Amino acid sequence: MEVLMPVNLGLDEMKRVVEKTNGCMVWGGSLNLAPADDMFVRIEHPLSIDPLLLPSIMSKKKAVNANLLVLDIPTGRGTKVKTIGDAELLAKDFMELGRRLNIKVQCAITYGEQPVGYAIGPSLEAHEALSVLMGKANVPDLVDKATDIAGILLEMSGKKNGKSLALEILKSGKAEEKMREIIEAQGGNPQIKPEDIPLGDETFTVRSVKSGYLLWINNASLVEIARLAGAPKDKGAGVRLHKKIGDVVRKNDPLFTVYAERDIKLERAIERVKESYVLGIGERMEMLIHEVKELPVPKKTFMLER
């Protein structure tokens, strides 16, 4: 969001924006809230919780006096939380810590085995988000996740049918209107359009060498490629996907494009592309793997040990 407006607001500036717009978008590091961490470590000790992960998140929520909080826990290969079981345990820890801090917490365990939307990198993500808000782009998984999480928060605040309400707010243009109001209050250009957001001039597009379906995406590799291209420090750098898991892929179709602001960084990213398994393309996976119709002949004597 730093592409659209200043987000390194001080506490007084944040209060001013909230009082004016009933919302804000800030970088927590600019508020100097970390000293509260010590108190949370003492609270967490009897819960046997990681003394770093939870306080780093919850301390800042308590410091700004949040009373309702929705936490997104992306889950799956390529994420910090690999299984739904682990995600549920983490969610319970967050909720218990929230109870002790008088913050009502709910968690959304979300699918994390591919990027949300098609963009990785500050300008690319801002371009995509603004396009969706304006109704100019169709990004189903981004809309689905955003309205799911917004819907949970709406229901926590007493509204009914939260997801449907969130979708209506998005489709009606009210979400875009509020975003532009916040952009203006925080010193950005409220008239900004997606095409006004500069992207890196240096690009490289990876194309498929065969036809099939996109079966998997290596999130960690994509993030590393975006980082080598210059993101997030270089706002115009990053990766834009052209295909998502399950999409049909034909030979020579574009799979993703790397953006960089400097050619030397693009070259580094391209080297990593060549070294990595970024995407998996093949035939659509079937549920039946293999039929076993006859008792297999053992290769050695079967012995039951007690």
Language model features with spans:
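Phosphate/pyrophosphate-binding betaalpha-module
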Residues: 2-64
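Well-ordered secondary-structure scaffolds
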Residues: 48-53, 60-306
